[in-house]
Amino acid sequence: MGWFWADQKTTGKDIGGAAVSSMSGCPVMHESSSSSPPSSECPVMQGDNDRINPLNNMPELAASKQPGQKMDLPVDRTISSIPKSPDSNEFWEYPSPQQMYNAMVRKGKIGGSGEVAEDAVESMVQVHNFLNEGCWQEVLEWEKPHTDESHVQPKLLKFMGKPGVLSPRARWMHLCGLLFPSHFSQELPFDRHDWIVLRGERKAEQQPPTFKEVRYVLDFYGGPDDENGMPTFHVDVRPALDSLDNAKDRMTRFLDRMISGPSSSSSAP
């Protein structure tokens, strides 16, 4: 997931048991493919003449109606609960249904042999927004010990899609599934995103806070069908093992779960 909008000038957990049909997949959920774009590029669709926003790796998609489009889709964008810049009180914005539609047209998902119906786009946006909000709540849970100490709320600086790039944990869990199929799933994540979170630090009570960049890895997995036969999925959210602080946070949570019991689908650090 992780599809937000920002102005160019602006410098594993089950998410609520959300069940979505195959028509409601977020356009940044990629199938593994050797032709997947590099992680620094737009995770939706590249264009030679598009300007790519470095904060969300997205081209500036127009909100105008497409030729041949039958439905009138809303152009209003929803403000998320996720803070954006450390220098302002702005929040990330989600794409409007019309922008989502335009992105799907660019990917060839609508029109011709496309598999997404026009009347499914608004539901896609709702599911997309719901999942991003759930992922952010999981980030806040990880950040809580640091937030309690600094009294500074974290912010989301930027993010990138990495379809087809397996995280070390995803590889390990897949290997465990091959070796111990009765205890672990062999399923690989169908998408991955890396979020760069700004963790607030306060050296003195009277001084303004500073922010430290912390990378989070989000692996998206398909889940079992619900009672209505609709597919579900969950997201494994955790800080990347690229610093001692992150390793400490993950080990602390692992030990807490060993003592009190796991609160999500996996208890590995």
UniProtKB/Swiss-Prot annotation:
Keywords: Heme, Iron, Lyase, Membrane, Metal-binding, Mitochondrion, Mitochondrion inner membrane, Repeat. Its main location: mitochondrion. It comes from the Eukaryota. Residues 1-72 are annotated as: Disordered. GO terms for cellular component: mitochondrial inner membrane; mitochondrial intermembrane space; mitochondrion. Coiled coil: none annotated. Belongs to the cytochrome c-type heme lyase family. Present with 3870 molecules/cell in log phase SD medium. This is Holocytochrome-c synthase. The gene is CYC3.
